[in-house]
Amino acid sequence: MSSLGSPVRAYDFLLKFLLVGDSDVGKGEILASLQDGAAESPYGHPAGIDHKTTTILLDGRRVKLQLWDTSGQGRFCTIFRSYSRGAQGVVLVYDIANRWSFDGINRWIKEIDEHAPGVPKILVGNRLHLAFKRQVPTEQAQAYAERLGVTFFEVSPLCNFNITESFTELARIVLLRHGMDRLWRPSKVLSLQELCCRAVVSCTPGHLVDKLPLPVALRSHLKSFSMASGLNTRMMHGRSYSLTANSSHKRNSFRKVRTIRPPQSPPRNCARNSCKIS
């Protein structure tokens, strides 16, 4: 719980992606198709730079993306050198109806390798809704992506197809590469059965679970879940309990066992510095 007055972040991770490609391949269309956030040219940024933020959900975590479009400017080298600082991913965009834009990807890759070597990349074929004008076969683009060792998508901003999926996959690649996925591995998503067991056990004493109007198998599962939860809680508080058989009541019962702890202070007859470890 955050302290009073401290802002609550609306995301768990913040990533910066660059969209690169020739002019008129539809990078602005991709940004405009994203729902939250508005495409903008922020004050103080050079003309030809469009910026947009959006938040995606990745394995139960909120990932905020800062998306920058260089708009294929001829002075890309200078722009990329400035805006590649801190960029964690690059989206290579071409138009499937424009062969020249696909052939130009090699030039962009050389610039990226020079100014941001090793940054994760994906290849995106834009304007899938213009498939009837296709000039770049899907198989050829897929083979090219495999040679580069990058993931390949064909997207359509008009149909809102594969837009979020492509950004989500790039975010996953970036987080895996930096090992940030380990931060949320312990917080698994609970199953519906475990949630129901927790709800029942939290409001029902353990000795009353047998009296619930439930099937025998379910009562047995709830009882074992209650015993495990109670044992873990008591062990955390420094107590130990053992399960023993009580012949008079013909049922299992808990018996408290005192835990012998090592002395926390030296004996009274032990002088300071008189005990040495050889």
Curated annotation (Swiss-Prot):
Keywords: Cell membrane, Cell projection, Cytoplasm, GTP-binding, Hydrolase, Lipoprotein, Magnesium, Membrane, Metal-binding, Nucleotide-binding, Palmitate, Prenylation, Ubl conjugation pathway. Residues 248-259 have a biased composition (Basic residues). Residues 175-228 form the SOCS box domain. Regulated by guanine nucleotide exchange factors (GEFs) which promote the exchange of bound GDP for free GTP. Regulated by GTPase activating proteins (GAPs) which increase the GTP hydrolysis activity. Inhibited by GDP dissociation inhibitors (GDIs). It is found in: Cell membrane; Cytoplasm, Cytosol; Cell projection, Lamellipodium membrane; Cell projection, Ruffle. The SOCS box contains two defined motifs including the BC box that recruits and binds Elongin BC complex, and the Cul box which interacts with the Cullin family of proteins to form a ECS (Elongin-Cullin-SOCS-box protein) E3 ubiquitin ligase complex. This is Ras-related protein Rab-40B.
